[in-house]
Amino acid sequence: MRERDLADTSGWEPWQQDYRFGVILLMPPPHVAAPIDALRQAYDPKSHAICSAHISVSDPLRRQLNDDARKELQELLRAVEPFDVQYDRPTASARRPGVAYPVSPQERFDELKRVLHQSSVFEGFAYSRRDIPAHMTIAEFLTIEDSLRICADLMDRAPRGSFWCDRLEHVVPDATFRFQRRGTFLLGTSR
């Protein structure tokens, strides 16, 4: 990514500035993402507009992802074998707003995060949300009461299932803070 490829961040909120160089996400395949994106659109259009269905697996990048950094990340990810991701009934908390699918196996996501954060693009302090368990958000910009109501509404009708994780996506926000795919990293040694 060249400097001219970076978005004009002058209109962004302070918390959005951290994401200037992007983030690494697990993006579910289209047949999984489509019904989850429909829920995101219905219950939290703001989140849906920012990014489609995903599972966050990295801190925001600390610097631009140049060719050397891409090679470094790809080499690190060769050590992580692809795995099956399970997602079940959405959950909500009485302590903080949001509705999300818990995903498993959490140990594989922890391994993925550990390996990713060895890269030089994450040098510096650990981002405050690094230790949050991996999950797939349905809605986040709402109240606790709305979260609990939505979760109850979705309990028996939200899709659930599994999908194969064999790749990660580098996504970067544009000037309107809408994330765009910029690159793909394959997991494991079989390419």
Where are these regions (language model features)?
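Histidine-dependent nucleotide/RNA phosphoesterase domain, centered on the 2H-phosphoesterase fold
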Residues: 1-191
